[in-house]
Swiss-Prot record:
Source organism: Pseudomonas putida (strain ATCC 700007 / DSM 6899 / JCM 31910 / BCRC 17059 / LMG 24140 / F1)
Main subcellular location of this protein, as a coarse class: cytoplasm
Keywords from the named record: Chaperone, Cytoplasm, DNA-binding
UniProt-recorded Gene Ontology molecular function terms: bent DNA binding; unfolded protein binding
NCBIfam families per record: PRK10266.1
Subcellular location: Cytoplasm, Nucleoid
Keyword field contains GTP-binding: no
InterPro entries assigned: DNA-bd_curved-DNA (IPR023859), DnaJ_C (IPR002939), DnaJ_domain (IPR001623), DnaJ_domain_CS (IPR018253), HSP40/DnaJ_pept-bd (IPR008971), J_dom_sf (IPR036869)
Record-annotated J domain positions: 5-69
Gene name, Swiss-Prot/TrEMBL: cbpA
Protein name, UniProt field: Curved DNA-binding protein
Function: DNA-binding protein that preferentially recognizes a curved DNA sequence. It is probably a functional analog of DnaJ; displays overlapping activities with DnaJ, but functions under different conditions, probably acting as a molecular chaperone in an adaptive response to environmental stresses other than heat shock. Lacks autonomous chaperone activity; binds native substrates and targets them for recognition by DnaK. Its activity is inhibited by the binding of CbpM.
Domain of life: Bacteria
Organism phylogeny: Bacteria, Pseudomonadati, Pseudomonadota, Gammaproteobacteria, Pseudomonadales
GO cellular component: cytoplasm; nucleoid
């Protein structure tokens, strides 16, 4: 198993803030997205970027990674987790995310002694007491909000004896279905899925805080999606049919003649699902991209157009 330095994968410093990490992830995800990149190893690099953001975009996972990084792991070199830091439950982790063995070995489980729950409430140490509630952040990709498949998560819960004394930790694995209409920051309660109670007390609850991962192609506005559609000048001037990605696959979008940068075209029912099960809209925002006049023939064409076209984009200044 090789060490993965998630900072190197995203191309950021270990001191980078959340905004810089998100920006680096979006840049790489956009570059290597299967709908965009033709590079042979694009799919692997896209997966690596997703895995790196899964860790560095989550404060708890990032803190654990920073701790394990202190043991001197070098990117791409053989690595073995230090004593006392062992994966339990067969690696666990976010199996639905297609992440590496390194990810599973670090985040699939830790030996007793640490407390990975941060703000989890302290259980009272007496018989017949309710178990701890567990707080986790769950990274969700836009595509997962449309899928009816479950997402497998693994996390640690403290174990106690009948006297309420902590005896260690165990890894718990659940299959979680992403609710329709889920939004960033939403908190979901899974009753009885937290730590077990002591002395016959009830189990605690599991609280999942949803964190929507940035998408390389789409921005989110409520339950609507925004995608920037680059156009050549002749496509904007003459009209065209353009293949545009959606979460359901590509569609052919009709560009009307005389279209302008900044215009938005609405595609009904291609956004995210709301609480009632209806889909929002996809808005295609047009952006005219100028080709370079890099050779003599291209410059001649632009010169002829400038001579024949009675067009002044600054006419409003002369009023």
């Amino acid at each position: 198993m090789d060490f993965k330095d998630y900072y190197k994968i995203l191309g950021v410093e270990p001191t980078a803030d959340e905004k810089a990490i998100k920006a680096a992830y979006r840049k790489l995800a956009r570059k290597y997205h299967p709908d965009v990149s033709k590079e042979r190893d694009a799919e692997e690099k896209f997966k690596e970027a997703n895995e790196a953001y899964e860790v560095l975009g989550d404060a708890q996972k990032r803190a654990e990674f920073d701790e394990i990084r202190k043991y001197g792991g070098q990117h791409g070199r053989p690595f073995q987790a230090p004593p006392g830091w062992e994966s339990r439950g067969g690696g666990g982790g976010f199996e639905g995310g297609d992440f590496s063995d390194f990810f599973s070995s670090i985040f699939g489980g830790r030996s007793a002694g640490g407390n990975p729950f941060g703000g989890a409430r302290q259980q009272q140490r007496s018989a017949g007491r309710r178990g701890q509630d567990v707080e986790l952040e769950l990274a969700v990709f836009l595509e997962e909000t449309l899928s009816k498949e479950s997402k497998q998560i693994s996390f640690q819960v403290p174990q106690t004896n009948a006297m309420g004394q902590r005896t260690g930790f165990t890894t718990k694995t659940l299959n979680v279905r992403i609710p329709a209409g889920v939004t960033d920051g939403e908190r979901i309660r899974l009753k009885g899925q937290g730590a077990p109670g002591s002395g016959g007390g009830a189990n605690g609850d599991l609280f999942l805080t949803i964190r929507m991962a940035p998408h390389p192609l789409f921005d989110v506005e409520g339950h609507d999606l925004i995608i920037t559609v680059p156009l050549a000048p002749w496509e904007a001037a003459l009209g065209a049919k353009v293949a545009v990605p959606t979460l359901d696959g590509k569609i052919n979008l009709t560009i009307r003649p005389d279209s302008q940068s900044g215009q938005r075209l609405r595609v009904p029912g291609k956004g995210l699902v709301n609480k009632q099960g209806a889909r929002g809209n996809l808005y295609a925002q047009l952006k005219v991209v100028m080709p370079p006049a890099s050779d003599e023939s291209a410059r001649e064409l632009w010169t002829k157009l400038s001579e024949k076209a009675a067009f002044n984009p600054r006419t409003q200044w002369s009023k």
